[in-house]
């Protein structure tokens, strides 16, 4: 079978952010045109613009942040193609938390890969040590029963700001920072016996949140200098023109 070697430089244009010219971190894609950027770069750009930075198509006239989504597949590809990028990003996050004197979340305490890996000089492929494979299998079993309790946690207060819906009996919840707004919509819909979670909008500071926003992202971008808990409001979905 014939194989063809491709230099990383040849595909850089497909795995870098047009806004910062660096490799994609927390890859986020515009749903309208499928162009991808670093999440922090795109969110900052959309604070003053409503068009795609690449093709200039209008994402949405008033709420462009609702039409972007985390692209896990693209981020996985970038991490696999660029040696050491994921480990470097994890290290930067740990240093960030240490600098602020905050506890490092459980999901980034260790190295990005739980197994010890080395690069095969013959073909550039990554291989894991046998002992690490055994340790990884045992750790995975423990993680399966963890239910994200070791993740960074976020305290939330869910308030209803519409007379058309009732309030939750227990409006205070605590969950993983990796949970998304979509998870909250499903939770509220189940508690209120709604026919569909798509009937809801969730807001922070009177701004509608995109369904793919993680709670960590919401805290960092909308609640950074405010005290816990994170205050969110829910209401019946309003169609935006």
From Swiss-Prot:
Pfam families: RAWUL, zf-C3HC4_2
Keywords, alphabetical: Metal-binding, Nucleus, Repressor, Transcription, Transcription regulation, Zinc, Zinc-finger
Tagged with keyword Metal-binding: yes
Basic and acidic residues compositional bias, start-end: 117-139
Segments crossing the lipid bilayer: none
GO MF term set: histone H2AK119 ubiquitin ligase activity; zinc ion binding
ZnF segments: RING-type: 17-56
Keyword Zinc-finger: yes
SUPFAM superfamilies, per database record: RING/U-box (SSF57850)
Disordered as annotated region, ranges: 115-148
Identification of the protein by name: Polycomb group RING finger protein 3
Source organism of this protein record: Mus musculus
Designated gene of the protein: PcgF3
